[in-house]
């Protein structure tokens, strides 16, 4: 099962609001999901983003692939940098 971190559209017509969800890549955009890890509001001047960083890092460590838009959001929030640091630390452990 390929797992993706992607946006699910909420809100009303012409006023989008997105949830950042972890879902199976084969499920529809607004369909079944595994876990909600954040929200994204593009209508606010500063593009309001809330994230559960620990859960996002856990899913990335388990192999979840972010969509292009979510990858951009995570990099702006600094989560991807933490993920790469954690991955590089795990590679050097001997055990």
From Swiss-Prot:
Short name of one Pfam family for this protein? Ribosomal_S16
- List, alphabetically, the InterPro entries matched: Ribosomal_bS16 (IPR000307), Ribosomal_bS16_dom_sf (IPR023803)
One GO term (biological process) = translation
What residue ranges carry the coiled-coil annotation? none
Any single GO molecular-function term of the entry would be: structural constituent of ribosome
Record's GO cellular component, any one? cytoplasm
Among SUPFAM superfamilies, the record links this protein to: Ribosomal protein S16
Keywords for this protein: Ribonucleoprotein, Ribosomal protein
Question: What family does this belong to?
Answer: Belongs to the bacterial ribosomal protein bS16 family.
Report what the protein is called.
Small ribosomal subunit protein bS16
Q: Which organism is it from?
A: Streptococcus pneumoniae (strain CGSP14)
């Amino acid at each position: 099962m390929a797992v993706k971190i992607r946006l699910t559209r909420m809100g009303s017509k012409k006023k989008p609001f997105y949830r950042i969800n972890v879902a199976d890549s084969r499920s529809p955009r607004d369909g079944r999901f595994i876990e909600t890890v954040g929200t994204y509001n593009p209508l606010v001047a500063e593009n309001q983003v809330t994230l559960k960083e620990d859960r996002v890092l856990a899913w990335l460590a388990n192999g979840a692939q972010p969509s292009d838009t979510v990858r951009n959001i995570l990099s702006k929030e600094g989560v991807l940098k933490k993920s790469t640091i954690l991955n590089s630390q795990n590679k050097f452990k001997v055990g």
